[in-house]
Design a protein with these regions (language model features):
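Charge-rich, low-hydrophobicity low-complexity segments
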Residues: 2-124
Length: 124
C-alpha cells in the first residue's frame, strides 16, 4: 500500500488564462483628411511601393489633426478600406472626446500612450 498523499486534480490547478501588462510600439496613421476615398487610395499607393511592409499590421488612427465634426468622418468606410489593404486598425489616439466616442461606436477604442509621441513619420 502506498503512503503517498493523493495528488490534487490537475484541472483545478491549471489557470485558464493570465493577464499581463506589456508595451508595444504601434504605428499611428495621422488622419489629415477625414474622407476614406482620399486616405485609403493614398495609403494603398504608398504601401504598394513596399509590399508586405504593413501587411496585417495593427495601426492606431490619429484623430488630432481633424477639424471636422465626428458625423463627417466615415469610420466604417475607413475601417473597411484599411482592412482591404490588410492593415488592421485597432484603436485611436488624439481628437476630441466626441470624435473618440464616434470611433469607439465602430469598435475603435482610445489607445493610451505610455511615452511622448515619436516625431518620426512617413508621409504620402
Amino acid at each position: 500500500m502506498s503512503s503517498a498523499a493523493p495528488k490534487p486534480d490537475q484541472a483545478t490547478r491549471l489557470e485558464p488564462f493570465r493577464l499581463r501588462g506589456a508595451n508595444f510600439n504601434l504605428l499611428v496613421l495621422r488622419l489629415l483628411d477625414h474622407r476614406p476615398e482620399a486616405v485609403v487610395p493614398a495609403i494603398g499607393d504608398q504601401f504598394r511601393r513596399a509590399p508586405g511592409f504593413l501587411r496585417f499590421a495593427p495601426i492606431v488612427i490619429g484623430l488630432g489633426d481633424l477639424q471636422v465634426s465626428p458625423a463627417e468622418v466615415d469610420f466604417p468606410g475607413l475601417i473597411k478600406g484599411l482592412r482591404e489593404l490588410e492593415i488592421m486598425p485597432i484603436g485611436t489616439t488624439g481628437g476630441t472626446s466626441e470624435m473618440r466616442n464616434a470611433a469607439l461606436s465602430y469598435g475603435l477604442p482610445p489607445v493610451r500612450s505610455a511615452l511622448k509621441p515619436n516625431t518620426a513619420e512617413l508621409s504620402a
